[in-house]
Amino acid sequence: MDKLVIEGGVPLTGTINVSGSKNAALPILMASILAEEPVTYTNVPRLRDIHTTNKLLSILGCPAEFEGDTVSVRPCDLKPEAPYDLVKTMRASVLCLGPLLARLGEARVALPGGCAIGARPVDLHLTALEKMGARFELEEGYIIGRCRKLKGAHIYFDFPTVGGTENLLMAATLAEGETILENAAREPEVVDLARFLIACGAKIEGHGTSVIRVQGVPRLHGCEYAIMPDRIEAGTFLVAAGITGGELLLTGCPWEELDAVIVKLNAMGMHIEKTSEGVLAKRRNGGLRGTDVTTQPFPGFPTDMQAQVMSLMCLAEGTSVVQENIFENRFMHVLELVRMGADIRISGRSAVVRGVKRLTGAPVMASDLRASASLVLAGLAARGTTHVQRIYHLDRGYERIELKLNAVGARIRREAE
């Protein structure tokens, strides 16, 4: 197991290229199951979850090959079972459920794993698929799904679930008739999935709004498709510029998709602007100021940026309040930040952050993907040395982060524990 060792206190200066989006790539790769012809993806990040997805696709009968940032998938002899050995490491693996039911009429998918950050029930997926004619039972830790042919249905989500919207969107492309997804997730990654499916021949309208309409088609063909840039990786590097007092230019950075994050960072005393070369981020003269953040579904402030911005709040003048409305138990990074000298108090789904003058390096332990990023950011700004343990979480969502940070002046290295 590896750890990161960070010598803090160095302003980061230079250019970072933003990788392809993990959260877009995972469902789009799963959608390969729907196509009857080869599919080629570019701008795919080389991450642990992507490699796991490629292995899963190969086991399901869609051999996937990775070369550079390109993944080629060749659907051939489809099989319905997603085994526990792969699914246990990644919650997104449940996204193969809808495509398998649409193509084969059956699926046997182990209950998913992934980050332990609260309840992420698959019930919303199953209830919606049942409205399309699927039947489910739980057997020895596996979701067993069967259907003759999925039928179009009017589905209302009680909450704009991203995974549920993606699963139903994929299933609906090959269903008989029209499917309407109401109170659907509007996240950019959902829009990217819809655009990919349309490129394969699907008939979809309304993606990016709360009502998506899908007219089922008999088959989907192959295509070539470029994965969108990762807005969460980009947001993490924007915070890195602010927390170290440096100046970073992000190339390939999604601008519109980061609006809620940029508004808050500018309010805290950063200057972020779009230029002809990319997105420029630096700290304004006068230091950082506290602000309040409430996580919400898109286009609100993303929960996946909450932990990183909290690290910045730790060094901002005044008091900041974070309200976490999406996931339970997503303050697991707080105790580790406190070990570094942060002043944070938790009350239910709220965290009150009182800014301090400095953070101090310490041994800390990552509990999930975004908590890992939060601790790396804190380590970059801290006085002294920070050891971030259990970075396998980090490797699930950030492509070679230590190499990218070192290239702009950070002193960070990976060591075996």
UniProtKB/Swiss-Prot annotation:
It is found in: Cytoplasm. It is an enzyme of class 2 (transferase). The keyword Cell cycle applies. Pathway: Cell wall biogenesis; peptidoglycan biosynthesis. GO terms for biological process: cell division; cell wall organization; peptidoglycan biosynthetic process; regulation of cell shape; UDP-N-acetylgalactosamine biosynthetic process. It catalyses: phosphoenolpyruvate + UDP-N-acetyl-alpha-D-glucosamine = UDP-N-acetyl-3-O-(1-carboxyvinyl)-alpha-D-glucosamine + phosphate. Its main location: cytoplasm. GO terms for cellular component: cytoplasm. Its EC number is 2.5.1.7. Gene3D superfamilies: Enolpyruvate transferase domain. UDP-N-acetyl-alpha-D-glucosamine binds at residues 91, 120-124, 304, 326. GO terms for molecular function: UDP-N-acetylglucosamine 1-carboxyvinyltransferase activity. Pfam families: EPSP_synthase. Signal peptide: none annotated. Cell wall formation. Adds enolpyruvyl to UDP-N-acetylglucosamine. Belongs to the EPSP synthase family. MurA subfamily. This is UDP-N-acetylglucosamine 1-carboxyvinyltransferase. It comes from Nitratidesulfovibrio vulgaris (strain ATCC 29579 / DSM 644 / CCUG 34227 / NCIMB 8303 / VKM B-1760 / Hildenborough) (Desulfovibrio vulgaris).
